[in-house]
Amino acid sequence: MPTPDFILRLRKHVGHELLWLTGVTAVVVAESGEILLHRRADDGFWSTPGGILEPGEQPAAALVREVAEETGVDVAPERIASVVTEPPFTYGNGDRVQFMDVTFRCRPVGGSARPDEEESLEVGWFAPDRLPPMNERVMRRIAHAREEGPAYYAAP
C-alpha cells in the first residue's frame, strides 16, 4: 500500500519512531446482508477496506475515498461502529505506528466491486456465515458493525 506523502515527510525527521495515526475502517453491508471485503496487495489477506486520514481530512470523507480507491464501491457511512486504539505495530522496514481506528458501518450506493491491483488483489461480497479467514481485529470490527446500539469503545 502506498505510504501517504505526509508520512514520508515525517519519517525524514523521526526515522522509525512510533507515529500516532488515525485510521478508518469500513464495514460495508449490502441489503442482502453480504459484507464487502478485499484481499490486500501488501500481505495477501482478506480485510475490510480502510486507510489513513490525510491531515485535515474528516474521518467519513477519508472512509468514502479509501473504499472507492480500494474496491470501486461508493458508500454512504451510516454510523460509527467502534472507536479503538490498536496495539503498536512495526512494519518490515522498521517503521513503528499505532492507530486510533474509527470503524463505520456503511451501505453501498454505487460503483462496482473491482480490485485496483495496487492495494487490492480481489474484491468480493461475502455472506456473514461464509467469510474468508481473517485476523481477529478485522472480525471484531465486523462484529461491532453488525451490532445495533451505541458504538463500541474500550471502557476506562
Which stretches of residues belong to each language-model region?
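Short connector loops at helix/strand junctions that flank enzyme active sites
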Residues: 21, 30, 41-43, 48, ...
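Residue-level recognition of beta-strand microenvironments
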Residues: 31, 80-83
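Acidic/histidine-enriched, glycine/proline-rich intrinsically disordered or flexible terminal extensions
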Residues: 7-11, 144-156
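Conserved Nudix-box catalytic region and its N-terminal flanking loop in Nudix hydrolases
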Residues: 30-70
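Acidic, metal-coordinating catalytic segment for phosphate/diphosphate chemistry
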Residues: 1-25
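Active-site beta-strand termini and strand-to-loop segments that position acidic
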Residues: 28-31, 106-108
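Unchanged
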Residues: 53-77, 84-141, 155-156
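A structure-centric signal for secondary-structure junctions around beta-strands
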Residues: 21-23, 32, 120
